[in-house]
Amino acid sequence: MVVGILIGIIILGVVGFIQYTLIQKASKNRVESLEKEASLTLEEAKREAESTKKEAILEAKEEVHKLRADLDKETRDRRNEIQRFERRLIQREESLDKKGEMLEKREDSINKKSIEIQELEERVQNLYGEQRAELERISNLSSEDARTLLLDEVRREIKHESAMLIKELETKAKEEADKKSREIITTAIQRCAADHVSETTVHVVALPNDEMKGRIIGREGRNIRTLETLTGVDLIIDDTPEAVILSSFDPIRREVARIALEKLIVDGRIHPARIEEMVERAIKDVENDIKEEGEQATFETGVHGLHPEIIKLLGRLKYRTSYGQNVLKHSIEVSYLAGLMASELGLDVNLARRAGLLHDIGKGVDQEYEGPHAVIGGELAKKYHESPAVVNAIAAHHGDTEMQTLEAVLVQAADAISAARPGARRETLEAYIKRLEKLEEIATSYEGVEKSYAIQAGREIRIMVKPDQVDDAGAIEMARNIVKKIEEQLEYPGQIKINVIRETRAVDYAK
């Protein structure tokens, strides 16, 4: 057993030696191989480095050659440019030399002419002195006296010629102005087609049958009295078949009465309470119509941006007349005419139209305003923020204030043209209406008066007083005072009945 172990150990030793010998040999071969490869790599690197060095040297030589060539070219260009500049300098120097010679020659010529001119001036002065002395000797006048006479004569001739020229120009200007104004006014009138004429103070309401007349009158006339009292309108019921005539100088009252009566006829129930209700509705309808008419007028004339109160005043002009002419239609017509004339003259068309439309708004206010309607209209326009030009045109269209713009003159001319149109106005009707207005103005001037209506063509005035401010004795005294004031201030045919009405109502409700 020991022998076997020894043999194994020996075998292992032999095998280990063989392996060691083989490993050593392999390592030696590997080292030699690596050394050989390293030597080859080093030689290859040396060859590549040598090649790169040669290429770099060649590139550097080429770059140096290129830079030298560029420098030579730039040097040649600079040399050529310097040569061209030198040639130009030489040419300019030669040109300056020639100009200098020419200037010297011209200076010599000028000096010679100056000497000649000086000699001529001396000769002229000598001749002038000799002639003046000769003239003074012949005329026995000094030079100052002769100059004064000559200037006076020239002055007289110029003044005469100027006066003749001014007169001729003024005549031509007037002729041209008259001709141009006629053309402008004719053109404006032709382009403005107005179809409205004067209005009357009555309105006819159609009835379905004659039996309706009795219902309108009512028992013992209470219905017709109530309607007349509430509206201030005369109801004329005569033999005219199927018709009732409403008579009042105030178109607003007449319109309220017409609407209320037509509503009552359609409704069929006619008694004092129903009449009061229908009159209140009619008043609201008329107020709405006033607003719509004002807006329609601004739309027709192209005038925008008006204050709502101004529009309301415009609408009220529908129910105002001037010598029988509807004031709203008249204002629209004036707006058109003023705008057309402004366009012909190259003025502000919008300003002329606006002022023309608003020129009579002073007629739309109630009796609490005093003064000419033009001045009142100007104050209202200023109050509602209209421009100063519009305010002046309104206030000045009847000459109450001085006109400050040409558009104001056009508004005045358009107002006159519209009023002078055939069929537009009636003088007698206006005088009649003014008398009725004066009657109502006198009545309402007393404290405690609520409403007053001039009826029966001015032969009667009904005055409603406030019962809490005027008692029965006060009503009698007021009637006497009004009679006295009317007799002092008005001229009228016949007599006028003063009817002061004091009414007290007590209303309560059963529940």
Curated annotation (Swiss-Prot):
InterPro entries: HD/PDEase_dom (IPR003607), HD_domain (IPR006674), HDIG_dom (IPR006675), KH_dom (IPR004087), KH_dom_type_1 (IPR004088), KH_dom_type_1_sf (IPR036612), Ribonuclease_Y (IPR017705), RNase_Y_N (IPR022711)
Lineage top rank: taxon: Bacteria
Location, primary (coarse class): membrane
GO molecular function terms attached to this record: RNA binding; RNA endonuclease activity
Topology versus the membrane: Single-pass membrane protein
One GO cellular component term noted in the UniProt record for this chain: plasma membrane
Annotated compartments: Cell membrane
Domain HD span(s) in chain numbering: 327-420
Domain KH stretches: 201-286
Enzyme Commission number, as recorded: 3.1.-.-
The keyword Calcium is assigned to this record: no
UniProt keyword annotation of 4Fe-4S present: no
Family, as annotated: Belongs to the RNase Y family.
Described function: Endoribonuclease that initiates mRNA decay.
Protein name, entry field: Ribonuclease Y
Gene: rny
